Amino acid sequence: MLGDGNEGISTIPGFNQIQFEGFCRFIDQGLTEELYKFPKIEDTDQEIEFQLFVETYQLVEPLIKERDAVYESLTYSSELYVSAGLIWKNSRDMQEQTIFIGNIPLMNSLGTSIVNGIYRIVINQILQSPGIYYRSELDHNGISVYTGTIISDWGGRSELEIDRKARIWARVSRKQKISILVLSSAMGLNLREILENVCYPEIFLSFLNDKERKKIGSKENSILEFYQQFACVGGDPVFSESLCKELQKKFFQQRCELGRIGRRNMNRKLNLDIPQNNTFLLPRDILAAADHLIGLKFGMGALDDMNHLKNKRIRSVADLLQDQFGLALVRLENVVRGTICGAIRHKLIPTPQNLVTSPPLTTTYESFFGLHPLSQVLDRTNPLTQIVHGRKLSYLGPGGLTGRTASFRIRDIHPSHYGRICPIDTSEGINVGLIGSLSIHARIGHWGSLESPFYEISERSTGVRMLYLSPGSDEYYMVAAGNSLALNRDIQEEQVVPARYRQEFLTIAWEQVHLRSIFPFQYFSIGASLIPFIEHNDANRALMSSNMQRQAVPLSRSEKCIVGTGLERQAALDSGALAIAEREGRIVYTNTDKILLAGNGDILSIPLVIYQRSNKNTCMHQKLRVPRGKCIKKGQILADGAATVGGELALGKNVLVAYIPWEGYNFEDAVLITERLVYEDIYTSFHIRKYEIHTHVTSQGPEKVTNEIPHLEAHLLRNLDKKGIVMLGSWVETGDILVGKLTPQVVKESSYAPEDRLLRAILGIQVSTSKETCLKLPIGGRGRVIDVRWIQKRGGSSYNPETIRVYISQKREIKVGDKVAGRHGNKGIISKILPRQDMPYLQDGRSVDMVFNPLGVPSRMNVGQIFECSLGLAGSLLDRHYRIAPFDERYEQEASRKLVFSELYEASKQTANPWVFEPEYPGKSRIFDGRTGNPFEQPVIIGKPYILKLIHQVDDKIHGRSSGHYALVTQQPLRGRAKQGGQRVGEMEVWALEGFGVAHILQEMLTYKSDHIRARQEVLGTTIIGGTIPNPEDAPESFRLLVRELRSLALELNHFLVSEKNFQINRKEA
């Protein structure tokens, strides 16, 4: 795959490695760093001192398993214990205890966390790196104005400006600016020190008048001047300690803390040698920045490209978790300080355990995972989705951009993205370009930068050495592009290669090349790398394909693709969908839910995932691949997961497709399919829905789960057991009771029905005072009950003691309205399901499975689907599978076409079917109309592409309403499927009906069917007795609402009723 002459062997890194490395960095370094920052806490009399001993902290292994945490809605976390000491200064006694600080959510083998039973993942964020950046803008006179922006670690910004007279100003707010001399003086320098530390002292002296000298005469004067401009305070403020503290808090802490990365960037940009541990902005930094700004004014130095990746940093999982840990420790410090003071006040003897409570840390992390924009619910539609979600990069989030304000330049592809951020895989819509995906080989470096690997080409060494370079480093090298991998050094013409140098693309001699790419997939994300023949597709269609593969539903019988790229096995392995042997041994027992592996003198039980629900309601299930008694090795696959076959990703099916218009049924991307796909369960998928109900303890008593529900029909309760919960294996329909529940309530004597009062008076029967609050199966939920769980929360309050969950499995065949897609952005909706005898058929009598519109190919420019289609046909006839790396034209011109035609020709010879490859129209064939038996006029492309069924299914979207709830104010039906809402007849619909003159239908839609309260009540009665519907005389509710709104604007509006007989006008009050 990497060529013959100059290849090196490299393995693709684990796709979850980014998440693992981030979490390990947090556990190893982040925890310790934040714990060391925890201060020593003293009481008000300074007699007692509390401190933490960081060296002895420990994390305890969780007591519960991951699967139990999901089912019981718990957090899979580890308890953090730290040694703490309480020192009495008078007696010099110390009490030391190991204290429990709180729970830290752990990361599992998929790179995700389980919080309150939900899989959550933390997204990496791209931020502007702290440091100084220079740019130039034109003012209103067309003159270039140079500015230097200092960005702190907190995201705060300060600007240095240089005006026409070469005076330098520091902008402290949008409107206020002060002289650089005042700022330097306020930071502690006098005039002599300032002039000694700058390269252009004469420029600084040129704008030093008497007024300026007075301002910087002393540090106090400078601070007062600075405070006056920064806080916009009028009058004459007085210098004080509190004024300095306020300035320190509001300005210097937020805008002058550079951090570790900012200090490194500042030193490199301004040629400084300030130690790395000095993370605050110093006067020396300000003066060096001013010198650089003066140099730019006179044509020395270069401006910065703010969108270059060398000026960005990645805020990884480690940084986000460390920030939250620091926040939790600040809250813990406040709690300890308050507890010490309270204990002294009440003359109690405190101990370290009594002073520290766990809620600050636990609640901080729970709120972070639940509310932070970068913590998202893991998308688990299929195995590919899980991996891709963890490799996302977002410009959005706290301290970042927003979809409304981000410019086109930020969203656009930048040359520095090469090999680091995928140029194809991004969101569609308002977030396009703001949410990207990591390239396959990219990694996050020590300084928060994205690094990409290259092979070093050296004449001195014959071996191949791999380098990881940060975004700024590779600009100094000549980097050969991917098509140099198969370079033949013996041919003189091929010694000129395309290369990249300083963001430009050149053609240079091979001897001048310093580095070369290591892999054809190096530039792309996982989703884009799974598209065969991607080089023949338009990038917009490749983007749609990489997004739609994540929406593919796992099918009941998966099938691996005939034409792939070779990355399917790695994607399946890293997804966690497969069961893999952790050690070698022999299989001694197999079952649907577990495998027993014997080895090293003991037996290991490996549990399998059986009918597990994902958060997109798809079915996660593992199927055995190894027989009983077989000896296996470590790392061998024991069971396939959902959407995997033989350890490879299998998201769809290879089906026989013809590209031909058919009676308009495939107009505008509609798709025609055969009934074989339904009857043989080709595109059948299982979906699992979860329904839950809680039992509370009310003021009238506890709610009761029972099967004795009064006033309900018996057939609705037929599936309940003695406890009142639906039985496993039951088939349930819409409206059936899943859990019977009664809620006690106080009922007044007057509210009893007459028959209830009669029973109480004559027979003395006590009528039930409970209200029925059962869990009923909503519309569209019919299916088979596969699991029931009655969960009591550990340590839960009596307010919400129990939860009952019912899991129902649905079998969904493909039907009209479902969405299908290929791997090249070719998507469509099923428009009709034809009998197989009516479908077009091939010369060997086989009917095609799908009919696509050929007009969807040329305008979309996704020709890769044609290559895949024809090669898939050859592969199915020859019983071969192809794994083709992209950009195979690097070997020779028209390599893809030659491969496809040669395989079709071989298939034609081996199967003795000349129609497979006809030289007059290669790749096409004469096919016949199934209805008439006549051949179509033109030869047609037929083949076997890989087609996916997507999560956008008609069962989840189609909706109808006969009756339902109404809005309180307008009395119109609610909106939306979830609320059993109705359709709105808007302006354009009214115009359409007016155009056809259907006055009575229009009146019905605007009155009876909408918001006329009295009229819609009369409709029910007249429908039952078979009478005629009366004409409504008064106004509908929305008209009455409009009248009242106009009255609030002092406008009176009335309507009148004109009699048909005598034309009398009767005024009606709205």
UniProtKB/Swiss-Prot annotation:
Any one GO BP annotation for this protein: DNA-templated transcription
Catalytic activity entry: RNA(n) + a ribonucleoside 5'-triphosphate = RNA(n+1) + diphosphate
A GO molecular-function descriptor: ribonucleoside binding
E.C. number: 2.7.7.6
Pfam families tied to this protein: RNA_pol_Rpb2_2, RNA_pol_Rpb2_3, RNA_pol_Rpb2_6, RNA_pol_Rpb2_7
Biological role stated in the UniProt entry: DNA-dependent RNA polymerase catalyzes the transcription of DNA into RNA using the four ribonucleoside triphosphates as substrates.
NCBIfam families: PRK00405.1
Protein name: DNA-directed RNA polymerase subunit beta
Gene it is expressed from: rpoB
